[in-house]
Amino acid sequence: MPVLKVNGSPHEIDLPDDTPLLWALRDTLGLLGTRYGCGAALCGCCTVHADGKALRSCVATLADVAGAEILTIEGLGTAATPHPVQAAWLEIDVAQCGYCQSGQMMQAAALLREIPKPSDADIDAAMSGNLCRCGTYSRVRAAIHRAAEFI
Amino acid sequence: MRFPSLILAPILAAATTIAVTAEEVTLPQDEVASLAAFDRLVAVIEHPRCMNCHTSTDFPRQGNARLRHNMGVARGPENHGTPALQCATCHQDNNAPSGVPGNANWHLAPLSMAWEGLDRRGICRQLTDPARSTMTPEQLVEHMNNDPLVLWAWNPGNDLNGLPREKPPMSAGEFGELVRVWVANGAQCPD
């Protein structure tokens, strides 16, 4: 049975290889922090990390991520020791409705892993695929700069 | 020297005489064969399935209308997107049922292989100029016959509306053979 490594733990997954990763995370593993938005990699809502890189889990199949270390919002940090992005998100009070925010934070964390002190242009380039109906973009940008200060 | 492309199509036996505006010029058979092959294969190069990622811009295009790629997607330093928004963030190993196209090595062609904005003569010059092209003619034969990302053009899947993407105007095999003929006869470019 295929093994999916999520947030540091291996999980045996009895699903077809062409199952989207998001389905396995939410429906099989019960990790509901990763959200379904568009199902076509158009909104960024379902962003997770695969081996440290941002990945849209709604279009990546289990075959695509075979052997990869998957990180979801549940594994990014804890309440006691939040990831700098999560700490900054709380401090800036980024979220409005919150639906897209786990994807926003995972994308931001991927950016900071690549560019620890990003410019506004770096942030725009990295975050332009993460949509927010509430229009929290200016707070997202501010929070990423704040998270960079924490790192 | 100038001559219309229409007269290049016939297969010619030996040396060929072509009427031009001011004089008659005799072309060797191999040169005629090469030019005739290029005249046909370039229609594939100009097709959106190829041209959308052989852009001269800092971003790819998408669709037959060749619109700028959604979501501000950019070329990035290695032609694989920006550091945190790579092509592989969305494009996986295979075409997705949702309509997102896929290939294991999805990326933009480097600017040294940009064809966008060039006419057919310019495309040919770009392909064959050692100072600009990153591939030798022999490497072009390999690339255009066997590169899985090139061959994706003939397996482009459905778009986001569920409609089949248009394929280039000839088969992959025919295109590959024309590239072979073009290169084997000197990789000639139209004047």
Predicted regions and their residues:
Chain B
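Short, well-structured alpha-helical interface segments that form or flank functional binding sites
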Residues: A36, P48, T82-L85, E174
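The canonical Cys-X-X-Cys-His
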Residues: P48-T57, A84-N94, V179
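N-terminal export/targeting leaders of redox proteins
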Residues: M1-V42, Q62, V73-E78, N95-D191
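N-terminal, post-signal-peptide region of Sec/Tat-exported proteins
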Residues: E46-H80
